[in-house]
Regions:
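Aromatic-rich peripheral "rim/lid" segments of glycoside hydrolase catalytic domains that contact
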Residues: 2-22, 28-169
Length: 169
């Protein structure tokens, strides 16, 4: 079984509990001992986020340390004075410059996994669109003017909306 199938099968098992999965406290290393550690971190982050995001039971994914070298270090740390900082697991370097993992996750979240588009209304049929869960700012332009509303698409909630322009200001 490939690693992807193995991870997904574990998510399936946890998903059977019927509670939302929160993937938290992620630390993917980028230290120099990995060769091009930042490329390793980028590739691992992209693969894992795609798996986690695609699973229906996943509700949240939380990266642990945003910036390298800022994790709390206990005096009796397992690897001297560095503690978790040894792994360089942040999405940003110590100087706040973006690492490749930041760039790939920013692209996934703000571009690939974002729904945007235009729908031309057809009075003769049910008008539909396909998008990710979340909030949608809707702008409707008619001969009578432009109207705005917000629609919420959430898991386990019916997603059929009727928009009455007479009730919008």
């Amino acid at each position: 079984m490939s690693n992807v199938k193995y991870i997904f099968s574990h998510l399936d098992q946890y998903g059977k509990l019927g509670i939302p999965l929160n993937i938290s406290e992620i630390t993917l290393p980028s230290h120099a001992e990995l060769g091009d550690g930042e490329e390793f971190q980028r590739a691992a982050a992209e693969m894992l986020y795609r798996i986690w995001f695609s699973h229906p039971a996943t509700e949240a994914i939380v990266w642990w340390n945003m910036v390298d070298d800022t994790a709390y270090v206990q005096a009796d740390s397992f690897n001297g004075q560095q503690g978790e900082n040894y792994y360089k697991g942040g999405l940003l370097r110590r100087d706040f410059s973006e690492k490749p993992s930041w760039k790939v996750l920013e692209h996934l979240v703000n571009h690939e996994w974002r729904t945007a588009g235009t729908l031309d209304y057809d009075a003769e049929k049910i008008n539909t669109f396909r998008g990710f869960y979340g909030s949608y700012d809707i702008e409707i332009r008619t001969d009578a003017g432009t109207f705005h509303t917000t629609l919420e698409c959430r898991k386990k909630v019916p997603h059929q909306f009727t928009i009455d322009l007479n009730k919008l200001n």
